[in-house]
Amino acid sequence: MKSQWKKLGLAGMAGVLALSAQLAGAKELTVGYVAAGMQYPFNVAAARGFEAAAKEAGVKAVVLDAKTSVERQGNAVDDLIAQKVDGIAVLPIDAVVAQSWVDRAAARNIPVVAVATQIGDPQKHSIKDVYPKLAGLVASDEVRAGADAAQIAARLLPKDRVAKIAIVEGAPGYPTVWQATKGFKDGLEKAGIKYQIVASQPTDWTPEQGESVCQNILTAHPDVDLFYNQADDMVIGCARAVRAAGSHAKLVSRGGSKLGINAVKTGDVDGTVCIQPGKMGRLAFKTLYAAITNPGAPKGKFVDVDTPQVTKTSLSACVPEW
């Protein structure tokens, strides 16, 4: 009997030693996150969500800031590849250029997850048609978000004549700009709204540019009925321009930021669509971690983050994350 216990004890000890050796030899995972520009609250929220999820999982996260430079973002991805990180998440500035970065990482068996923005030409591929070399894409369907904004707008626009609409775009190069515009127009047509786009101008995603663009549009088209801003930051500036001009133009936006939700609450903005960058960041890490720990998992996964509409009567639909 003693001999049997001794054998069991030795076997147990051997198991413990084997497990200890395995743990000692286990590699600490390191993942990289490349932001488009940390001067934007949206980007900060997405990066923080990613970092928080990585910390909870005991994974080291390296966050790099491209400062809105496509070249700098590409170099950051290349640096992470050279460092042989276990995985990379990126919020791409230029969706088409970013395709080559994903190709280079895939050639070295480093999984990549795109955050908020698809990889590839949005005019040739729907957002759900995920670039096959990506481990996954975590984003909101921006065409749907544009249609959500159109539903809000349709309730505000005149029905007895052609409505005059101006679009305040985001920065050139972002696929979101084209997707949000397409969704908005499709949504208006589905609602049976007769409309004319009297102006559509790009910005740099800032309140200052939003105000400047709206001032210029109001000068050229003082009778504009509605401004569709493609981010809450711009709509804050646009609201200032509308008030200063004494205009009665309605304001619809996209974002769900703290500033945007508060502007809806106070009545300065008529409605917005809730985008959740923090949630995207957290889900991006989860998707990347799954790809790292299960290399055989299917690639090209689309993780859709919903986009609830927010008006004065539905403020609780969105918890601001940026």
Whereabouts are the PLM-identified features?
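Flexible loop/hinge segments that line or gate small-molecule binding clefts
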Residues: W101-R144, K164, S257-K265, V269-D270
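Short, solvent-exposed amphipathic alpha-helices that sit
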Residues: F42-A57, A145-A149, P175-K194, Q209, ...
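Sec/Tat signal peptide C-region and signal peptidase I cleavage site
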Residues: L19-A26
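Extracytoplasmic "Venus flytrap"
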Residues: T30-A57, V62-D79, Q83-V85, V90-A95, ...
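Hinge/cleft segment of the Venus flytrap/periplasmic-binding protein
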Residues: K124, V168, P172, A191, ...
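Hydrophobic alpha-helical segments within soluble ligand-binding/sensing domains
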Residues: Q73, A135-A163, G210, G256-G260, ...
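Bacterial N-terminal signal peptides that target proteins for export
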Residues: M1-G12
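Hydrophobic alpha-helical
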Residues: I93-A107, G183-F184, V198-N262
